Amino acid sequence: MQNITQSWFVQGMIKATTDAWLKGWDERNGGNLTLRLDDADIAPYHDNFHAQPRYIPLSQPMPLLANTPFIVTGSGKFFRNVQLDPAANLGVVKVDSDGAGYHILWGLTNEAVPTSELPAHFLSHCERIKATNGKDRVIMHCHATNLIALTYVLENDTAVFTRQLWEGSTECLVVFPDGVGILPWMVPGTDEIGQATAQEMQKHSLVLWPFHGVFGSGPTLDETFGLIDTAEKSAQVLVKVYSMGGMKQTISREELIALGQRFGVTPLASALAL
């Protein structure tokens, strides 16, 4: 019998959650991570599945995700503990045939349930599937320190925030030319914040929750982690720059245009226009 804890997707989740903890992005039970799988990914591990998988209804149907398996982090679980006990802190779930709920096939032992942000994740998965023709498979939420700090001092506007991050590090425009969506402050763990996040995910692979954290989307765990890491590095640079009295010089609009042309990306027009 093959052991599911040695699968690429469980090992990938262990690495991503451990790396995020070491970065300082996921204190206590902060943060959550979901990865969309295929049936072929989980097929070799049926012998590891629960004999009687628990069924949990969704707060709203998501037919686009019907019959789709995911691996998810658990509610109230600490990222730092995933590496110690994957089965207690992670779960493989599969949405049912009408998208109305899901079964917990593996993991989430002792009656644990998926992250409370699952509505935001699933709604965002739906939008990123449509926006990327199915390429994006990962949604990651974390409390990236410097990005959060900037939401207290910058105007919480997509164009303004995006332009500042682009100027904070040359690679940013190349990595997220679509910019950073920003929500107003909202109560977490609700359908409302999930819907608002998903709406921004139609246009942006990064979405900021002011005074709280960031959502990122990508095709792989590495790409999604790298996306957030890149934005966070720029935010760290900006925090240092602002603390030293602000910018004396920066990357110009013309230079940003040239950067986009060199790497074949189309920068967010509203951010470029500032």
UniProtKB/Swiss-Prot annotation:
Its main location: cytoplasm. The keyword Zinc applies. It catalyses: L-rhamnulose 1-phosphate = (S)-lactaldehyde + dihydroxyacetone phosphate. GO terms for biological process: pentose catabolic process; rhamnose catabolic process. Coiled coil: none annotated. One of its GO terms (cellular component) is cytosol. Its cofactor is Zn(2+). Binds 1 zinc ion per subunit. SMART domains: Aldolase_II. The keyword Metal-binding applies. HAMAP family: RhaD. This is Rhamnulose-1-phosphate aldolase.
